[in-house]
């Protein structure tokens, strides 16, 4: 078979396959719910991140300090390009971790009214619970994020410690956004470019988030806003 004939045969097979897949869209996935899937987190790659260590299972080829990555797909968003997100929901989390000196690791999530939260002490930059474990106050921004190929998906952009100042500023900007009528913009009515910048103090250097509002609402961003609205409604209902 010559190359031209082989190419035509391949195209026909591909066309038939495409038709079959379209006709069977979603088949076999009926029993998979949100509880059965892992929500991706958006994180920054720092100097000691495992994503930079070639002998680590979490290593990502091509990753560099300051890049942002998706914890599920392992997609990298380069530092100066970043990722576009539309916020959908915000919530505070109070998370308990073992200290690294004790082995480290997540212990549990505390309720916002847990009395232990009001009984913490400071040891340098670490906030300690009465039992000696670390309390990490976290801002979780549920967002719709856009991948490099244009696909969009729910993600969690969580911020803690030095990132909290960025989160508070972002919340302030979202809370001050207005519609032409002067009414308050819904949380999913704005889109943002998330990149990173280098910060430093007497304890070292690290990368932190930088968020810039996108004023040009393209059809792609409109789609993200609609998805973010659906996400907000689902989360609000406990779905």
Per-range role (PLM):
Residues 137-142, 153-155, 185-192:
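Generic beta-strand structural signal
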Residues 1, 20, 37, 119, ...:
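Detector for methionine-enriched segments
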Residues 110-121, 168-170, 183-188:
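Short linear motifs at secondary-structure transitions and domain/linker junctions
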Residues 1-150, 201-202, 206-208, 213-218:
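OB-fold ssDNA-binding interfaces and closely related basic DNA-contact patches used
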Residues 142-177:
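Short acidic, glycine/tyrosine-flanked loop/strand segments centered on an H-E-D-like triad
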Residues 172-239:
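Long, compositionally biased interface segments
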């Amino acid at each position: 078979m010559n190359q031209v004939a082989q190419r035509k045969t391949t195209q026909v097979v591909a066309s038939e396959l495409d038709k079959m897949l379209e006709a069977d869209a979603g088949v076999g996935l009926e029993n998979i719910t949100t509880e059965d899937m892992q929500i991706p987190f958006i994180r920054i790659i720092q100097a000691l991140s495992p994503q930079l260590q070639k002998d680590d299972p979490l290593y990502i080829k091509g990753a560099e300090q300051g890049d942002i990555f998706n914890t599920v797909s392992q997609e990298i968003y380069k530092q100066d390009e970043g990722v576009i997100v539309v916020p959908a929901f915000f919530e505070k989390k109070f998370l308990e971790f073992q200290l690294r000196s004790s082995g480290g690791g997540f212990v549990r999530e505390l309720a916002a009214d847990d009395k232990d939260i009001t009984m913490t002490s400071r040891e340098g930059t670490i906030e300690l619970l009465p039992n000696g474990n670390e309390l990490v106050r976290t801002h979780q921004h549920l967002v719709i994020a856009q991948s490099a190929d244009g696909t969009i998906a729910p993600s969690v952009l969580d911020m803690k410690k030095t990132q909290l100042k960025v989160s508070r500023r972002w919340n302030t900007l979202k809370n001050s956004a207005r519609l032409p009528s002067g009414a308050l913009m819904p949380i999913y009515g704005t889109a943002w470019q998330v990149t990173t910048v280098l910060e430093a103090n007497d304890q070292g250097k690290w990368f932190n988030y930088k968020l810039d509002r996108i004023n040009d609402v393209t059809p792609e961003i409109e789609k993200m806003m609609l998805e973010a609205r659906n996400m907000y409604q689902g989360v609000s209902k406990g779905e």
